[in-house]
Amino acid sequence: PAEADVILLNTCAVTANAVTDARQAVRRLQREAPGVPVVIAGCAAEVARKQLAALPGVLRVVEQDHKSRLLDAPPLVLFAEEAAGNVTPFPSSPAEAAARAATRDRTFPPFHIDGFRRARPVLKVQDGCSHGCAYCIVPLTRGPARSRPPKDCLAEMRRLLEAGYREIMISGINLRQYAMRDEGCRDFWDLLSYLDGELAPEWGSGARPDPARFRISSVEPAQLTERGIATLAETRMVCPHLHLSLQSGSADVLKAMRRGHYTPEALLSAVEGVAKLWPRFGLGADILMGFPGETEAHVLETLEVVRSLPLTYAHVFPYSARPGTVAAELPDQVEKAVRQERAARVRAVVEAKREAFWKDTLTCERLLVALDCNEDAGAASGQHGVDECYVPCRLRTPLRGEGHTLIPVRPVSLSRKGVIVEPVRP
């Protein structure tokens, strides 16, 4: 950091702790690189702009709507003193921040990626969210839902494939709200079908010696409709892996969260349909325990859903109140120790499912692993990556010159961190 002209700090604000972490990061950078100006972007820049701007060494706090200008050249033009006069005043209240978010630009910002340091680049096709879950600050920090034009998505996908990448993550803040109807895509499933139809003949399995694949970052349970599952069945390049924004297995809690657009029963039925499509598939979920008003009966409902789902992993969080959200003002807040205990109970069930799936992976004759050849990993630790079902894998013996490609391997043993594999040679 000390050799930099300017340090750009991209921040998160999904929890109150994330904003605290951003402030601590600025202070740490000032110790490590005294005198180097810091420019702050990201979600914390939207909800905690005033506090961050007051920190010593901070040259500029860039709003989300202006973030794309960071790509301009020369970048230091953005940080000139006279530009400060164009910054929107700080919102004086959460209500004002919400009103501002509702009027923000709905155009997807122009940018593209030609290269990526890791093995699995991210293709961002959607940003923002217009739903408004009770616990979530994202609509304020990221603004309303915005979708990337399909042809733009395809062009970037081609650039990444031609650069040698063989697994690409299709990502968005809320893929359920993807829509470009004027360009032939009613929803995310239309986009996925379009990308697969255009690329599979050249890049799909069987089309070339080094095929490529897509991975979907996360889907809303309500997206798993009959048409959605049918689209997955028709694609040739999508990994057999889904990550669900589940949040709770209780219908009552989902309604309190303002997530009543799906029910646990409908989700279980949809996942049964996915299981018929993919005999072996990875299934992850985000689960939030201890939401205000959650009772022991609700916890038992969630545990029953978790036991019923063929989960292979899950991110289980104890709820934490986020200032500026509806949930932070709700009555019947659950004590911190109880929240943590409930999350631990769910994690224990998920952990058993994860271990069982890893053991089952040992019965597979062949896996295709996207290796992460990041220089920071170091050859001494062995290269690591994920298989098509998102099982973490590590090569028993490191390979050289295999970055970004899909490596055929066979599983040989288990470790605490995943499956140990070795290459399958032709």
Predicted region positions:
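Short glycine-enriched, charge-decorated loop/helix-capping segments at active-site entrances
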Residues: 13, 142-143, 182-185, 255-262, ...
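Intrinsically disordered, low-complexity coil segments
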Residues: 77-105, 114, 184-185, 197-212, ...
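Residue-level signal for inorganic ion chemistry
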Residues: 8, 43, 70, 170, ...
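Short flexible coil/turn linkers enriched for glycine and charged/polar residues
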Residues: 116-119, 129-131, 238, 248, ...
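Active-site proximal loops enriched in glycine and acidic residues that flank catalytic Cys/His/Asp
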Residues: 172, 218-220, 246-248, 285-289, ...
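Conserved SAM/AdoMet-binding glycine-rich loop
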Residues: 38-39, 47-48, 162-299, 307
